[in-house]
């Protein structure tokens, strides 16, 4: 059996690693680098270029140079319309995504392009190891859906690799980080790469790696930060020269490269120069672009993206039923975590300084190599327990969603439930497979349907139909329905079981929690009413007790009447506002009372007055 390699197939860069002498080692590519750009290009003569050499010629050949392809893999065209606008090459398709290659007058699937990157990594690994590499463990973002995982496996197959395991990137990072950890730790992996964002919380220690929860955003990454800068540069150039560069593919490619370079530089310096001579040619001569960008402006331009990093962190903590105090260590993964504002956000949200001991570019591939070592038997005593991100079930009588596998269940897993017929003499059942957190089928994501025929006629409720859900270690789902009376069986493998955008996932979770949120809202309303009634009571008592000036008393009485009316009309917004107003009025009553006391009982001996500060005894 040959060596099994671990591959981090990244949006921007890819890395390959292997176990050597019981330790994971990152393999240097043919060009002498430890990371390989995930870029494929075709020249006018039909030559294929992969990696650094492809990236270098991108400015001169933007329409035939393909990068950030991971953002398109395993997706429908209507899911990637925004991402398609961010690249200079042409992305087309009716349903499935196609990438146009004018140089060859053909088009490719994203899997085919990714396969070229995988093939180069495998070839470089083969030269390093000294024997052909045919098996691999490949990483994917934790929030990749089933079709994206399947497409990644297909890319490996096209590259001539047997993909033994698909492993989540944050989980791989935890393997690399926690390989030699003996004591138990709860770690949060914050993985912000070139095109995707994941957060996973794991229990790590003594060879056991258990994922407690995962969250993410498959539409957020370093590319989006670059896009913000490119848009800014285009606007600045238009102000200076009155020229719109949005349709100039070569200029866009140069701006994209300049944006990426500026982003990287601003991680270590506070200001950088962008100089692009001959950016545009006009009848009056060439136009150059020179500008200065400081870190503060970069952070301002990217503030919405940085803020989006907060939600998955909070969601992961909530799903794991943990607070920030429960997190022992924070591990940063992905080149985009080098952005100072991102690190500051992580530190602010979790109140913890992130670990600097791992290389964010290499740690995922290192973890994949550890998993490869486990599969090859080279690494012993490692137990990896990952989870599925959303609940899975079937539609039952009344349109109800009956959950069979609940969200954040450890995988691989197999679970079965017994169901029966809804009418007398029913000889077939339709199994409608669903994904989501809501109580009714119509509110969840439909994954597919299949029919089980040949059920023996019987009164309703008598036949026993066993429905089994099976999720393998790669996260791929299959469903089987079996009539226990006749032995008839039918199954379906769900390809695309998690074809959901981050927005859909968030919506499902939010809607599932709607009842809890409604209870909280009702409780807040009751508390507000109680507060209002208490303030009215207190104000009326004080008005009776203290003799106030008419010009002070009249407005307070008016506020009390308005608040009583607002309570009757259930106008809670007005109740809140008037409560604050009445609270301020009560403070004024106190001031009036004390000022009267001071004027009616003057101090005979001012020297007897002692200035003192009092602290409340607890």
Curated annotation (Swiss-Prot):
Gene3D superfamilies named in the record: 1.20.1270.10, 3.30.420.40, Actin, Chain A, domain 4 (3.90.640.10), Substrate Binding Domain Of DNAk, Chain A, domain 1 (2.60.34.10)
Organism classification: Eukaryota, Glaucocystophyceae, Cyanophoraceae, Cyanophora
The keyword Plastid is assigned to this record: yes
Function in brief: Acts as a chaperone.
GO MF annotation list: ATP binding; ATP-dependent protein folding chaperone; unfolded protein binding
Alphabetized UniProt keyword annotations: ATP-binding, Chaperone, Cyanelle, Nucleotide-binding, Plastid, Stress response
Cross-referenced PROSITE patterns: HSP70_1 (PS00297), HSP70_2 (PS00329), HSP70_3 (PS01036)
GO CC list: cyanelle
Region listing for Disordered, in residue ranges: 595-618
InterPro entries assigned to the protein according to its UniProt record, in alphabetical order: ATPase_NBD, Chaperone_DnaK, Heat_shock_70_CS, HSP70_C_sf, HSP70_peptide-bd_sf, Hsp_70_fam
Subcellular compartments: Plastid, Cyanelle
Originating gene: dnaK-A
NCBIfam families xref list: PRK00290.1 (NF001413), PRK05183.1 (NF003520), prok_dnaK (TIGR02350)
Family: Belongs to the heat shock protein 70 family.
The protein, known as: Chaperone protein dnaK
Alphabetical list of Pfam families matching this protein: HSP70
């Amino acid at each position: 059996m040959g060596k099994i390699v671990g591959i981090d197939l990244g949006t921007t860069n890819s890395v390959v690693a292997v176990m050597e002498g019981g330790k994971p080692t990152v393999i240097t590519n043919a060009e002498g680098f430890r990371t390989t750009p995930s870029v494929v290009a075709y020249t006018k003569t039909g030559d294929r270029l992969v990696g650094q050499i492809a990236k270098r010629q991108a400015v001169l050949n933007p329409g035939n140079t393909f990068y950030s392809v991971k953002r398109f893999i395993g997706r429908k065209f209507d899911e990637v319309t925004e991402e398609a606008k961010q690249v200079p090459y042409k992305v087309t398709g009716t349903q499935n995504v196609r990438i146009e290659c004018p140089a060859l007058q053909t088009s490719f699937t994203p899997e085919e392009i990714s396969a070229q990157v995988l093939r180069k990594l495998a070839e470089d690994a083969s030269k390093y190891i000294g024997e052909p590499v045919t098996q691999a463990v490949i990483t994917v973002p934790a929030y990749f859906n089933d079709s994206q995982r399947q497409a990644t496996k297909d890319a490996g197959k096209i590259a001539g690799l047997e993909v033994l395991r698909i492993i989540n990137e944050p989980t791989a990072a935890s393997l690399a980080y926690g390989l030699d950890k003996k004591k138990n730790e709860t770690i949060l992996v914050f993985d912000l790469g070139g095109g995707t964002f994941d957060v996973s919380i794991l229990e790590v220690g003594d060879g056991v790696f258990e994922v407690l929860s995962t969250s993410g955003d498959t539409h957020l990454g370093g590319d989006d930060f670059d896009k913000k800068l490119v848009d800014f540069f285009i606007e600045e150039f238009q102000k200076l020269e009155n020229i719109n560069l949005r349709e100039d593919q070569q200029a866009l490619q140069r701006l994209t490269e300049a944006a990426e370079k500026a982003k990287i530089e601003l991680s270590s310096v506070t200001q950088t120069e962008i100089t692009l001579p001959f950016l545009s040619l006009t009848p009056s001569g060439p136009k150059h672009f020179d500008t200065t960008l400081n870190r503060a402006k970069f952070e301002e331009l990217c503030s919405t993206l940085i803020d989006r990093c907060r939600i998955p962190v909070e969601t992961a903590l909530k799903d794991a039923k943990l607070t920030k105090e429960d997190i022992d260590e924070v591990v940063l993964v992905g080149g985009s975590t080098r952005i100072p504002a991102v690190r500051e956000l992580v530190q602010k949200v979790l109140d913890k300084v992130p670990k600097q001991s791992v290389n964010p570019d290499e740690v995922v591939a290192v973890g994949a190599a550890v998993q490869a070592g486990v599969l090859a038997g080279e690494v012993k005593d490692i137990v990896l327990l990952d989870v599925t991100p959303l609940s899975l079930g079937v539609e039952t009588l009344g349109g109800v969603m009956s959950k069979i596998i609940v969200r954040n269940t450890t995988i691989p897993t197999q679970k079965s439930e017994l169901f029966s017929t809804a009418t007398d003499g029913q000889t077939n059942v339709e199994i409608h497979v669903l994904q989501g957190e809501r109580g009714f089928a119509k509110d969840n994501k439909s994954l597919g349907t299949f029919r089980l025929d040949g059920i023996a006629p019987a009164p309703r409720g008598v036949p026993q139909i066993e429905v089994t859900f099976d999720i393998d270690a790669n996260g791929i789902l299959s469903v089987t329905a079996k009539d226990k009376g006749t032995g008839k069986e039918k199954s379906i493998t769900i390809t695309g079981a998690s074809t959901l955008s981050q927005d859909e996932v968030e919506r499902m979770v939010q809607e599932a929690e709607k009842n809890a949120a409604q209870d909280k809202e009702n409780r807040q309303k009751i508390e507000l009413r109680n507060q209002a009634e208490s303030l009215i009571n207190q104000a009326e008592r004080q008005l009776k007790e203290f003799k106030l000036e008419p010009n002070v008393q009249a407005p307070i009485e008016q506020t009390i009447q308005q608040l009583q009316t607002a309570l009757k009309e259930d106008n809670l917004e007005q109740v809140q506002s008037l409560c604050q107003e009445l609270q301020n009025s009560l403070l004024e009553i106190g001031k009036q009372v004390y000022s009267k006391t001071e004027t009616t009982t003057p101090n005979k001996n001012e020297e007897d007055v002692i200035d003192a500060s009092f602290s409340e005894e607890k």
